[in-house]
UniProtKB/Swiss-Prot annotation:
The gene is CLE16. Residues 71-103 are annotated as: Disordered. Residues 76-93 have a biased composition (Basic and acidic residues). Belongs to the CLV3/ESR signal peptide family. This is CLAVATA3/ESR (CLE)-related protein 16. Residues 1-21 form the signal peptide. Coiled coil: none annotated. GO terms for cellular component: apoplast. Glycans are attached at residue 98. It comes from the Eukaryota. It comes from Arabidopsis thaliana (Mouse-ear cress).
Length: 103
């Protein structure tokens, strides 16, 4: 009878110590997570002393606005038949001969 009560005490002590270790472990994770979140808030983009030159203009623009186009076409549009004259390329020409990929 006495041996049985010793086992219960050991088992109870083991269970409470394991539960205590687990509670301390999860509290430690919680504290470090909160510390990480609060320290990352210090380095938010609006808190940097100076932005890189390329990123400066990008961050000033609202996220829903598209960037302005820098290329504008003001000349006359070319007709379809004039394109072949400009590039001097016949699109229907099929090159024949040995295939260089198959030796």
């Amino acid at each position: 009878m006495e041996a049985c009560s010793r086992k219960r005490r050991r088992r109870r002590a083991y269970t409470t110590s394991t539960t205590g270790y687990a509670a301390v472990f999860f509290c430690g994770i919680f504290v470090f997570a909160q510390f990480g979140i609060s320290s990352s808030a210090l380095f938010a983009p609006d808190h940097y002393p100076s932005l890189p030159r390329k990123a400066g203009h990008f961050h000033e623009m609202a996220s829903f606005q598209a960037p302005k186009a820098t290329v504008s076409f003001t000349g006359q549009r070319r007709e379809e038949e004039n394109r072949d004259e400009v590039y001097k390329d016949d699109k229907r020409l099929v090159h024949t001969g040995p295939n260089p990929l198959h030796n």
